[in-house]
């Protein structure tokens, strides 16, 4: 199953003592690992905000939330989760792709 996740920094929690260069590097490294493993299919940074949109390919919503919960920003308590929604191919628009 694929899930779309909209994540941002919790501004009330993301102070300079928590949001260090090492933490940012750890977050980026973990996203790269999950992309390499195929758990994260796509990752986009919003142009107008400190936020990202991820597409995860996992067994269910619980696994999706577990993956997000294990991200360094989440562990540090600064990751806000706005949307977690299951998505599927739009077969009427792309019939050749069908169900994944």
Predicted feature locations:
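Conserved, structured core segments of small domains
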Residues: 1-100
């Amino acid at each position: 199953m694929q899930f779309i996740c909209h994540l941002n920094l919790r501004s009330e929690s993301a102070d300079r003592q928590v949001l260090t260069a090492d933490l940012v590097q750890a977050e980026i490294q973990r996203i790269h690992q999950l992309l390499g493993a195929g758990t994260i299919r796509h990752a986009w940074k919003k142009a107008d905000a400190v936020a990202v949109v991820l597409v995860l390919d996992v067994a269910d919503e619980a696994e999706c939330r577990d993956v997000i919960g294990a991200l360094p920003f989440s562990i540090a308590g600064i990751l806000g989760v706005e949307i977690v929604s299951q998505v599927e191919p739009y077969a009427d628009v792309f019939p050749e792709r069908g169900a994944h």
